């Protein structure tokens, strides 16, 4: 899919949610899709962009069909970094309410930081590293990824009154602390 084609399609879709990750139980695409079914009632033009690949891809696509959400969910597997970055930049909320699956736990949430660079706030899960990358209720929200109502209400509260705009602005400021130049200066000051 070309960048122009995607951009013209996205012009009519809002709000825009995005996940960039492996299709893996721990990443919790299922709960986002189930929440999307309810969000669609209030926001009929909502779209969920899924970028990635993995073992759960077919199960996730089957769930989208089962819930009749094919016009709300866009899948991208093998795309250029330019297209990926453009899709992130054109999104409103980065969504990855990770959970603990078996013994697998989300590490530091670099994907949340990458989204924040574009001024995109995140919804992350309470389990794992999301809270290291998301300042709850300032740069995004942390929810219980195991609880569908919490995933839904967290997304709804970010969308309502376009709260994601304020959270995104804060996220862009917050992420600047992860930039190498600042880290190097901090170490120089400590060592001197």
Region annotations inferred by a language model:
Residues 14, 61-79, 83, 93:
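Nucleotide-activated donor-binding/catalytic signature segment of Leloir-type glycosyltransferases, i.e.
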Residues 6-8, 13, 43, 155-173:
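Conserved donor-nucleotide binding/catalytic region of nucleotide-linked donor-dependent transferases
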Residues 135-137, 141-148, 157-162:
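Conserved acidic donor-binding segment of nucleotide-sugar-dependent glycosyltransferases
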Residues 99-113, 131-132:
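Nucleotide-sugar-dependent
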Residues 45, 150, 163-177, 186-189:
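A short, well-ordered alpha-helix in the C-terminal region of glycosyltransferases
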């Amino acid at each position: 899919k070309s960048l122009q084609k995607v951009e013209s399609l996205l012009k009519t879709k809002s709000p825009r949610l995005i996940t960039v990750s492996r299709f893996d139980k721990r990443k919790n695409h299922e709960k986002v899709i189930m929440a999307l079914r309810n969000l669609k009632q209030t926001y009929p033009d909502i779209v969920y962009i899924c970028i990635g690949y993995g073992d759960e891809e077919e199960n996730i696509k089957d769930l989208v069909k089962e819930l009749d959400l094919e016009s709300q969910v866009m899948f991208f597997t093998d795309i250029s970094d330019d297209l990926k970055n453009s899709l992130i930049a054109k999104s409103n909320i980065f969504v990855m309410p990770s959970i603990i699956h078996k013994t697998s736990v989300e590490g530091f949430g670099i994907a949340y930081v990458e989204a924040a660079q574009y001024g995109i706030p995140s919804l992350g899960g309470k389990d794992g590293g999301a809270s290291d990358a998301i300042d709850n209720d300032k740069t995004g929200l942390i929810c219980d990824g195991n609880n569908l109502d919490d995933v839904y209400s967290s997304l709804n509260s970010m969308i309502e009154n376009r709260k994601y705009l304020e959270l995104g602005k804060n996220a862009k400021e917050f992420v600047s602390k992860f930039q190498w130049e600042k880290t190097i200066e901090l170490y120089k000051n400590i060592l001197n």
